[in-house]
Curated annotation (Swiss-Prot):
Record PROSITE patterns: HSP70_1 (PS00297), HSP70_2 (PS00329), HSP70_3 (PS01036)
UniProt-listed GO biological process terms: chaperone cofactor-dependent protein refolding; protein refolding
UniProtKB keywords: ATP-binding, Nucleotide-binding, Stress response
Species this chain originates from: Solanum lycopersicum
Region of interest (Disordered), residue spans: 621-650
Protein name, as recorded: Heat shock cognate 70 kDa protein 1
Gene designation per UniProt: HSC-I
Length: 650
């Protein structure tokens, strides 16, 4: 592969259900299509007896192999097994999830006949690797650097885990950026030609599994996030689930059979529901038709748009809570919002547009000029160009001012949360505060770092990590001075340090030792595993190519001999020699489908050794090309390299 050492930096939208990749090229963003010609790729990984499939190939076989096809890794990443949302999701997933060390959820599949356990980070890293390969195929060079997006409302552990997934996939994640902020860049560049002055823009991002709302002020290339809100567990999949449950009950009512115990039937129903949901965005009614859904029973039904809306009405209304919270936090009235930008496939649902905008924003026109599926990857690609210094002046002048979505603080006496960094503070940021001891001659203090909005009690918030500052000299309470510093970097990841001013004793923690966080050693091991899987995939590809070459050569040779123009020029002995060799090769192929590469190659050499000299002799006998009409299937003349050649069709 030709190309510069490291190739350009790419932007990846790592989605719950679909992912998308873009790159800055020729002064614009190019959203890159995969090998199937699709500009978005399913975030699915399938494991079979022989291979690992990622993307479209994995999703296409999901009904045949539901328990070993993993999706929704984004709903697991950075969460604990005991999380209520994880427990709810597990009821709907066909694959198995078990608790690992530190309450970390582990996905269990059977791969090549062995039971394997994967962390959500590993599954996400496989999807990232696929997106990286899609970009490399397009660019013709290796790609090392990427900007990866996360929901704005992702907490610290979810961001860290996403960064780890990037490391496992072999990418250098230059920056983690928020999805609505990335979409705002796409909107800003799209609108730049037409607008002047300050604009307040609300990004409404409803995807397959997550929901974000961000309010930004855009002026002269400065994108300042004023507030952000959301729900990391609300999206298109939840609408699908409602429809699946609706039809499960209908099937039970009509046929007195319960399909919930059958993963394959449920998967086929879910696929049909996903398709129906999309159809209902443009028509008022659609049908579901599934042959032999369960125990030989065909299932035919219809659903109207009104019924679909009724099934999901509470969820659609739920979308408005973060919008109101976002406006409150930004201290803005909805009348001051200039543009509402819809992002994410689920915003195509007419009722979402109506509830969200027409009702709430009093019939305001929605901005639909940017592609809801691609806007996030577009913005990530622009940010990647900025960070690697590749874009033109149009993008190099952009400045992104993002915010932290949740308040950060520590626990003080009585289990109270003392906030150092309130939510919606622009990042990067650094905040210091002086604390002291609670009792006389206290030998040390325990610093417990929390994120969340419950000021009264830390136990209702999320504990990010804790550390001790010990060896404080004996002193009356409130005398020692302990400076605590919270420092958030541009990825939204937190460092906390504490220092005893009298002794100079220091201690610090990067909030990465979250209970479920992977250790450095585990990440290293996963990187090696990922390389091993990649090598196995390559090996399989070579095997398939070698097998196909032999098969193509054998069948071509058979057709060549059958062709009267050529067959008539061969002696019956030679003809029989070729036919026997070809028959023997084809029957060997049928019983050795899983042979090794060198076995296929040896067989190929053996077959060529018999056929090529005979064909070459025939051509020479015919005086070069005289009198032998060349046929498409006819092999070219020449020494041992003669014989039909086949070109791989991409």
């Amino acid at each position: 592969m030709a190309g510069k050492g490291e190739g350009p930096a790419i932007g990846i939208d790592l989605g719950t259900t679909y992912s998308c990749v873009g790159v800055w090229q020729h002064d614009r963003v190019e959203i890159i299509a995969n090998d199937q010609g699709n500009r978005t790729t399913p975030s699915y990984v399938g494991f079979t007896d022989t291979e690992r499939l990622i993307g479209d190939a994995a999703k296409n076989q999901v009904a045949l192999n539901p328990i070993n096809t993993v999706f929704d890794a984004k709903r697991l990443i950075g969460r604990r097994f005991s999380d209520a949302s994880v427990q709810e999701d597990m009821k709907l997933w066909p694959f198995k999830v078990i608790p690992g060390p530190g309450d970390k959820p582990m996905i269990v599949v059977t791969y090549k006949g062995e039971e394997k356990e994967f962390a959500a980070e590993e599954i996400s890293s496989m999807v990232l690797t696929k997106m990286k390969e899609i970009a490399e195929a397009f660019l013709g060079s290796t790609v090392k650097n990427a900007v990866v997006t996360v929901p704005a409302y992702f907490n610290d552990s979810q961001r860290q885990a996403t960064k780890d997934a990037g490391v496992i996939s072999g990418l250098n994640v230059m920056r983690i950026i928020n999805e609505p902020t990335a979409a705002a860049i796409a909107y800003g560049l799209d609108k730049k030609a037409t607008s002047a002055g300050e604009k307040n823009v609300l990004i409404f991002d409803l995807g397959g599994g997550t929901f974000d709302v961000s309010l930004l002020t855009i002026e002269e290339g400065i994108f300042e996030v004023k507030a952000t809100a959301g729900d990391t567990h609300l999206g298109g999949e939840d609408f699908d689930n409602r429809m699946v449950n609706h039809f499960v009950h209908e099937f039970k009512r009509k046929h007195k059979k319960d399909i919930t115990g059958n993963p394959r039937a449920l998967r086929r129903l879910r696929t049909a529901c996903e398709r129906a949901k999309r159809t209902l965005s443009s028509t008022a009614q659609t049908t579901i038709e599934i042959d032999s859904l369960y125990e030989g029973v065909d299932f035919y039904s219809t659903i109207t748009r009104a019924r679909f809306e009724e099934l999901n009405m509470d969820l659609f209304r739920k979308c408005m809570e973060p919008v109101e919270k976002c406006l409150r936090d930004a201290k803005m009235d909805k009348s001051t919002v200039h543009d509402v930008v819809l992002v994410g496939g689920s915003t195509r649902i007419p009722k979402v547009q109506q509830v969200a905008m027409t009702n709430f924003f009093n019939g305001k026109e929605l901005c639909k000029s940017i592609n809801p599926d691609e806007a996030v990857a577009y913005g990530a690609a622009v940010q990647a160009a900025i960070l690697s210094g590749e874009g033109n002046e149009k993008v190099q002048d952009l400045l992104l001012l993002d915010v932290t979505p949740l308040s950060l603080g520590l626990e003080t006496a009585g289990g109270v949360m003392t906030v150092l960094i309130p939510r919606n503070t622009t990042i990067p940021t650094k905040k210091e505060q002086v604390f002291s001891t609670y009792s006389d001659n206290q030998p040390g203090v325990l610093i417990q770092v929390f994120e969340g909005e419950r000021r009264a009690r830390t136990r209702d918030n999320n504990l990010l990590g804790k550390f001790e500052l010990s060896v404080i000299p004996p002193a009356p309470r409130v005398v020692p001075q302990i400076t605590v510093c919270f420092d958030i970097d541009a990825n939204g990841i937190l460092n906390v340090s504490a220092e005893d001013k009298t002794t100079g004793q220091k201690n610090k923690i990067t909030i990465t030792n979250d209970k479920g966080r992977l250790s450095k050693e585990e990440i290293e091991k996963m990187v090696q595993e990922a390389e091993k899987y990649k090598a196995e995939d390559e090996e399989l590809k070579k095997k398939v190519e070698a097998k196909n070459s032999l098969e193509n050569y054998a069948y071509n040779m058979r057709n060549t001999v059958k062709d009267e123009k050529i067959g008539s020029k061969l002696s019956s002995d030679d003809k029989k020699k070729i036919e026997d060799a070809v028959d023997q090769a084809i029957s060997w192929l049928e019983s050795n489908q899983l042979a090794e590469v060198d076995e296929f190659e040896d067989k190929m050499k053996e077959l060529e050794g018999i056929c090529n000299p005979i064909i070459a002799k025939m051509y020479q006998g015919a005086g070069g090309d005289a009198g032998v009409p060349m046929d498409d299937d006819a092999p070219p003349s020449g020494g041992s390299s003669a014989g039909p050649k086949i070109e791989e069709v991409d």
